[in-house]
């Protein structure tokens, strides 16, 4: 389970049979639908990359959208057709939020499905409609009456720290313990990605580090609370494949 299209795609490309996603932001589901339609349209990672890589001359272009739109549901078709009409310039707007991928142009480095071998595995999986979506945020996550091998929270806790719903380490620790107790299968894991969020919780607030140094600093500074774990066996020991899993038992 995750709240990120990229993590859902990486999991499917790595062999997951089903992925559950949750997000209260309806726009996120429209973006997911557009990404899935792109995968259904193009038989290679290069075709997908042309539309989604931010340094591509065809990034979010209306021309490629005209190829992709027929793989959208009627609701998603109506939404994206409205967005793309009149040549609305998505490239120069903040319509799709700028992230580290935009700043560093890294999405093809941090997501294995941009590799053609794994893209083809992803495409094969996507055609089986393996992604289940829920209209809720992390504070209502216990309404999902399922259990999972991996719950991948990515940077979600950062946002909820800012709005004080998960405002301190003790609150987050209790939340994660309940998450593991109620929703994780035996031997499963709740994973929090620290690859580019240096101030996720207060014990990270003092860090002033670069993207490249962050994993090592956290590992060395908090050896009792953190251990390294690769999200998938397809990764080597480079930064691209490493995330940090918070131990849930003090």
Predicted regions and their residues:
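Core SAM-dependent methyltransferase catalytic element
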Residues: 222-250
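Conserved SAM-binding loop of SAM-dependent methyltransferases across substrates and taxa
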Residues: 4-16
């Amino acid at each position: 389970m995750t709240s990120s299209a990229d993590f859902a795609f990486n999991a499917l490309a790595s062999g997951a049979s089903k992925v559950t996603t949750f997000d209260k932001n309806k726009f996120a589901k429209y973006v997911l639908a557009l990404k899935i339609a792109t995968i259904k349209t193009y038989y290679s990672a290069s075709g997908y990359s042309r539309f989604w890589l931010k340094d591509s001359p065809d990034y979010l272009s209306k021309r490629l959208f005209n190829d992709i739109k027929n793989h959208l549901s009627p609701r998603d078709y109506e939404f994206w057709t409205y967005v793309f009409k009149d040549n609305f310039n998505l490239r120069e707007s903040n319509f799709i939020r700028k992230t580290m991928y935009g700043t560093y142009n890294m999405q093809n480095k941090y997501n294995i499905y941009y590799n053609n071998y794994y893209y083809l595995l992803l495409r094969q999986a996507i055609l089986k409609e393996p992604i289940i979506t829920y209209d809720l945020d992390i504070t209502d996550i216990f309404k999902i009456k399922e259990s999972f091998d991996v719950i991948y929270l990515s940077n979600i806790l950062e946002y909820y720290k800012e709005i004080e719903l998960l405002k301190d380490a003790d609150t987050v620790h209790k939340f994660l313990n309940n998450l593991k107790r109620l929703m994780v299968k035996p031997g499963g894991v709740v994973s929090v990605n620290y690859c580019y969020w240096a101030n996720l919780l207060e014990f990270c607030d003092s860090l002033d580090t670069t993207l490249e140094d962050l994993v090592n600093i956290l590992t060395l500074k908090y050896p009792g609370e953190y251990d390294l774990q690769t999200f998938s066996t397809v990764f080597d020991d480079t930064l691209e494949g490493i995330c940090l899993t918070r131990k849930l038992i003090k």
